[in-house]
């Protein structure tokens, strides 16, 4: 499908190219994402083709487009196409890698205190039936990248001092919430020096900032495409360095590409799904046909990439704008609330820290938690919230944002305060962040004055 090559300015003009309700302000790209109308039309066209000739579409046509999608992603992240396969989401990709590891009893999987909850649970679940141990690198935000790296190195030394082997480290590019960019490049270098395998959770990466896997050199890398790349959900890809592909014996679920220890993989004779030229590796074959799946989001990757190139002006322009907007918008929200953004402590005025080198910003709300650490002041206008009040307050806040302001903002607690995560995007402007800041200010004042009402909206209520 051809994308209209006319460049559209970022901000409000770009919003018309997307599927969003014009009355809705999407400040949460890093959860559900969003995609342009041309991609929406593309997925509907593919559905029509599938339903018109289901077998012919599935067995002949979609394989060609999926190969094009993998090629586009490989170019985007500077990797070989033979190292990139398509999966439904990051959690699936990460668990697939973990499932295929042959752990020994002295092996340790190293995580961070900021590791995404679903990943943490997946590791705990697997450890119940596999012979490996887990160790978490503990630190509290806000902190500096140097301190995180130092604590990581200390933890590795402690593991080895006990006669154990740090086998695999799970790193993240951006913490989900409270959102900050991690020093993953430095952590990767430490792991490479220490001969520790690396599995990078890049859920919030591709489409938000440049990812160069040739330079990073991870063992495994997974990223969602539906968060920042303008692709329908769910959509992700898994990168496995060629040197490690022998470890990957099964996709999830196990299907025709599985290679028995004393045999070969055999796709059905009728399947044309692997590649147009039939030169796919065993690793590619493993993920080419994993039972009946919804491949529609993956089929839209080429259209999304063309839109980003032709209509948005290219990846570099997108990265520059959303990083600038997150900085300006986040500062504006903090100014309205008279609080602060989450970043490295002690940064001078106008200094740029690594933790904000992305399109997401986390801003402290004027809502302290009474049982928080000493970093929370003794006096807050209206008084601090008790632990019992926090849950109802957050529910009230998010519901009021939805009902009154037609937006939604993720909320988290950190070091005795409640924080809000806001995402920049090409169809947003600083004025959208100003709206969010003013909305948060009004609602927080209601919470602190204990004037919370019963926020109910029939438009958001599920019906049987």
UniProtKB/Swiss-Prot annotation:
Annotated source species: Epichloe uncinata (Endophyte fungus)
Keywords, sorted A to Z: Alkaloid metabolism, Lyase, Pyridoxal phosphate
GO BP field: alkaloid metabolic process
Task performed by this protein: L-cysteine desulfhydrase-like protein; part of the gene cluster that mediates the biosynthesis of loline alkaloids, potent insecticidal agents composed of a pyrrolizidine ring system and an uncommon ether bridge linking carbons 2 and 7. Lolines are structurally differentiated by the various modifications of the L-amino group and include norloline, loline, N-methylloline, N-acetylloline, N-acetylnorloline, and N-formylloline.
Induction trigger: Expression is induced in loline alkaloid-producing cultures as well as in planta.
Entry similarity comment: Belongs to the class-V pyridoxal-phosphate-dependent aminotransferase family.
Biotechnology section: Loline alkaloids show broad-spectrum anti-insect activity, and different lolines may have different biological activities. In vitro tests of NFL, NAL, NML, and semisynthetic loline derivatives with long carbon-chain acylations on the 1-amine have shown that many are effective against both fall armyworm larvae and European corn borer larvae, but the effects seem to differ depending on the modifications. N-Formylloline reduces the weight gain of fall armyworms by deterring feeding, and does not significantly affect corn borers.
The name this protein goes by in its record: L-cysteine desulfhydrase-like protein lolT2
Cofactor: pyridoxal 5'-phosphate
Modified residues (N6-(pyridoxal phosphate)lysine): 227
InterPro entries: Aminotrans_V_dom, PyrdxlP-dep_Trfase, PyrdxlP-dep_Trfase_major
Gene this protein is translated from: lolT2
Origin organism lineage: Eukaryota, Fungi, Dikarya, Ascomycota, Pezizomycotina
SUPFAM superfamilies: PLP-dependent transferases
Pathway this chain belongs to: Alkaloid biosynthesis
Domain of life per record: Eukaryota
EC number in record: 4.4.1.-
Molecular-function GO term, any one: lyase activity
């Amino acid at each position: 499908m051809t994308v209209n090559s006319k460049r559209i300015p970022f901000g409000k003009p770009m919003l018309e190219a997307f599927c969003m309700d014009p009355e809705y302000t999407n400040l949460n790209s890093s959860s559900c994402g969003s995609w342009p109308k041309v991609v929406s039309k593309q997925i509907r066209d593919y559905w029509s083709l599938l339903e018109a000739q289901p077998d012919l579409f599935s067995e002949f046509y979609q394989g060609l487009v999926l190969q094009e999608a993998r090629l586009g992603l490989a170019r985007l992240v500077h990797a070989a196409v033979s190292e990139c396969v398509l999966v439904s989401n990051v959690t699936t990709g990460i668990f697939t890698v973990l499932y295929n590891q042959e752990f020994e009893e002295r092996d340790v999987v190293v995580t961070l205190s900021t590791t995404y909850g679903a990943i943490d649970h997946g590791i705990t679940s697997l450890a119940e039936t596999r012979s490996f141990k887990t160790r978490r690198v503990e630190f509290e935000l806000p902190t500096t990248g140097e301190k995180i790296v130092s604590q990581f190195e200390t933890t590795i030394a402690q593991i080895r001092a006990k006669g154990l082997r740090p086998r695999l480290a799970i790193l993240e590019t951006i913490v989900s919430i409270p959102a900050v960019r991690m020093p993953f490049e430095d952590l990767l270098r430490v792991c490479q020096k220490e001969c520790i395998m690396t599995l990078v959770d890049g859920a919030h990466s591709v489409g938000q900032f440049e990812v160069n896997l040739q330079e990073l050199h991870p063992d495994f890398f997974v990223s969602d495409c539906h968060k920042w790349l303008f692709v329908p959900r769910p959509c992700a890809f898994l990168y496995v360095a060629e040197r490690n592909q022998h470890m990957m014996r099964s996709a999830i679920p196990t299907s025709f590409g599985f290679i028995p220890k004393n045999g070969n993989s055999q796709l059905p004779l009728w399947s044309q799904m692997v590649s147009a030229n039939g030169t796919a590796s065993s690793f590619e074959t493993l993920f080419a046909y994993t039972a009946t799946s919804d491949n529609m989001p993956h089929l839209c990757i080429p259209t999304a990439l063309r839109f980003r190139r032709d209509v948005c002006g290219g990846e570099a322009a997108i990265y520059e704008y959303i990083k600038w907007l997150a900085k300006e918008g986040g500062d504006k929200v903090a100014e309205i609330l008279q609080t602060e953004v989450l970043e490295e402590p002690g940064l001078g005025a106008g200094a740029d820290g690594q933790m904000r080198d992305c399109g997401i910003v986390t801003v402290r709300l004027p809502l302290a938690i009474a049982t928080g650490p000493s970093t929370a002041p003794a006096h807050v206008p209206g008084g601090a919230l008790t632990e019992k009040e926090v849950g109802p307050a957050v529910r009230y806040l998010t519901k009021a944002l939805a009902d009154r302001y037609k937006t939604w903002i993720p909320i988290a607690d950190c070091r005795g305060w409640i924080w809000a995560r806001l995402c920049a995007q090409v169809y947003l402007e600083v004025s959208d962040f100003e709206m969010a800041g003013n909305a948060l200010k009004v609602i927080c004042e209601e919470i602190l004055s204990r004037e919370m009402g019963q926020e109910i909206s029939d438009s958001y209520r599920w019906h049987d």
